[in-house]
């Protein structure tokens, strides 16, 4: 009888990583590729399982006070850092105190400064909130750093330390072995639990400006894995001998925001007009033609991958170009017989939409403009570098329409994105008027602790958003990961954030026995 090969320790796998990682410290992540590497080195108190439940990693469990303001986390015993030193509650306290340090100027610092962090009983850390926030345990996915290495250092010194680079280590499955201009070599952490089968994982870096180079590396055998493959590239990988293509949903949302308070008020102040534009867009056609079908047409603010996604809300206002035209006419926007462009009181319906100048944003913006032109709305597309779009338009709200693609995370809490009371200096799309019911749903969703109550609130949130139409919600994307059959045991959850592709990296193997 044939013997089934069993996974054996040893060997090396190579991933073609798109983008250049920077500071290998989870407190100073600046891009996706850095987050990818850090997820292999560091661990947080919590993570998300395949069913989207928040589960403990460096915490075994936690309790919540009756007023939902105090979370007491029990820190896991017996964990060691990669250098052999014991991990404990002091490391957790140290990490979060750095996040609260006034010299720490990374995004989100102000949020952490509003959270009380203190020692509890033996092996416990206590977090105290100013207001209930049901999604709080998920925010504790941030990687914990070793106090015995960084104690006495200011945040800037921590970021520039060799332990945030060529000597980086944590409690995760790997630690940095070496770094050069072409690759980061990670070595197995001898103290990790569970132990990876792989001795080494090499992350060979390729420029974000030319991701095809990373794909070519897998096709030529220079690398074993490549992720984040754009939809138009997938067909070059499907059917290739020796390659498996994995696909998972992501917690991203792509939508067009209407600026109803500022530059777009004269066009989008009327909710009937906004709703007409929502009805005028054929999402499925965009997904099919621009994204090769590798996304979910999604009319909701909560992605289709999310546990609180409402199919009922998604079906409230389906694509109907005829109804859209009638609603525009009812709102006083009449088509000019000669130009076919709609006008009202002498003002033509001509607006500007800003979008990032990269794939697929440019192609989606142009497809949207064509669809809206078909019902008499002229949309001029202005393409910009992503950084300029953020700084000069989204943060300042100096736009009429804006195409946005954003990772909203696994939890349905979108307070930061849609609540009208959010402080300035952050991306937010709430309106100044008529927003009370949305605010209440977002507040109630944070305050509710049990999943059924939260689900009911977020279903209502999606229903109201569908009727108010503050945006044209378009699609939620898929993550595509190509894996050489030389590497076994690679699997991902049905819905992930990009760095979650490494969640089960300890199952990967290239060597077998038996």
Segments from the language model and where they lie:
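Ligand/substrate-recognition segments at binding pockets and active sites
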Residues: 181, 334-408, 451
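Aromatic- and charge-enriched surface segment that lines or borders ligand/interaction sites
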Residues: 60-105, 126-128, 214-220, 267-268
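Ligand-site clamp/hinge motif
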Residues: 162, 190-236, 369, 378-380, ...
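N-terminal lobe/hinge region of extracytoplasmic solute-binding protein
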Residues: 16-66, 97, 169-170
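Surface-exposed binding/hinge segments that line
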Residues: 108-153
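Structural transition elements
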Residues: 297-337, 356-363
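Gly/Pro-rich hinge or "lid" segments in bacterial periplasmic/extracellular proteins
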Residues: 142-196, 200, 321-326, 510-514
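Detector for C-terminal structural segments
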Residues: 188, 280-311, 359-369, 390-514
């Amino acid at each position: 009888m044939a013997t089934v090969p069993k996974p054996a320790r040893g060997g090396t796998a190579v991933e073609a990583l798109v983008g250049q990682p920077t500071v290998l410290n989870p407190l100073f992540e600046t891009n996706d590729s850095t987050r990818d590497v850090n997820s292999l080195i560091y661990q947080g108190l919590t993570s998300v399982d395949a069913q989207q439940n928040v589960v403990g990693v460096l915490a075994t469990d936690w309790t919540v006070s009756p007023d939902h303001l105090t979370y007491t986390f029990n820190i896991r015993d017996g964990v060691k850092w990669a250098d052999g030193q014991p991990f404990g509650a002091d490391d957790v306290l140290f990490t979060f105190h750095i996040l609260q340090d006034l010299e720490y100027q990374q995004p989100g610092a102000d949020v952490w400064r509003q959270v009380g962090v203190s020692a509890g009983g033996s092996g416990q850390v206590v977090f105290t909130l100013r207001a209930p926030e049901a999604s709080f345990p998920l925010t504790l996915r941030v990687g914990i750093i070793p106090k015995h290495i960084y104690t006495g250092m200011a945040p800037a010194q921590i970021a520039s330390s060799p332990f945030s680079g060529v000597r980086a280590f944590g409690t995760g499955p790997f630690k940095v072995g070496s770094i050069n201009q072409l690759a980061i070599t990670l070595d197995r952490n001898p103290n990790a639990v569970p132990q990876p089968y792989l001795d080494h994982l090499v992350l060979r870096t390729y420029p974000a400006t030319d991701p095809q180079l990373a794909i070519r590396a897998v096709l030529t055998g220079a690398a074993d894995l490549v992720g984040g493959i754009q939809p138009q590239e997938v067909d070059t990988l499907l059917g290739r001998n020796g390659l498996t293509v994995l696909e998972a949903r992501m917690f991203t949302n792509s939508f067009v925001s209407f600026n109803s308070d500022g530059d777009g008020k004269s066009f989008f102040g009327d909710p009937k007009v906004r709703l007409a534009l929502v009805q005028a867009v054929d999402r499925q056609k965009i997904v099919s033609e621009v994204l090769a079908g590798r996304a979910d047409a999604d009319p909701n603010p909560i992605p289709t991958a999310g546990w609180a996604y409402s199919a009922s809300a998604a079906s409230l206002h389906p694509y109907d170009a005829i109804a859209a035209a009638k609603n525009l006419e009812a709102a006083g926007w009449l088509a000019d017989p000669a130009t076919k462009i709609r006008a009202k009181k002498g003002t033509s319906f001509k607006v500007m939409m800003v979008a990032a100048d990269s794939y697929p944003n440019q192609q989606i913006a142009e497809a949207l403009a064509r669809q809206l032109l078909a019902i008499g709305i002229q949309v001029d597309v202005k393409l910009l570098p992503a950084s300029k779009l953020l700084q000069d338009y989204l943060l300042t709200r100096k736009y009429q329409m804006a195409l946005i693609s954003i990772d909203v995370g696994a939890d349905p809490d979108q307070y930061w994105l849609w609540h009208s009371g959010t402080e300035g200096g952050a991306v937010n799309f709430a309106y100044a008027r008529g927003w009370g019911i949305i605010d209440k749903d977002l507040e109630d969703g944070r305050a509710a602790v049990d999943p059924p109550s939260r689900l009911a609130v977020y279903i209502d949130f999606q229903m109201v958003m569908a009727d108010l139409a503050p945006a044209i919600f378009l699609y939620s994307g898929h993550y595509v990961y190509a894996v050489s059959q030389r590497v076994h045991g690679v699997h991902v959850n049905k819905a992930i954030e990009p760095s979650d592709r490494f969640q089960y990296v300890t199952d990967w193997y290239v060597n077998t026995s038996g």
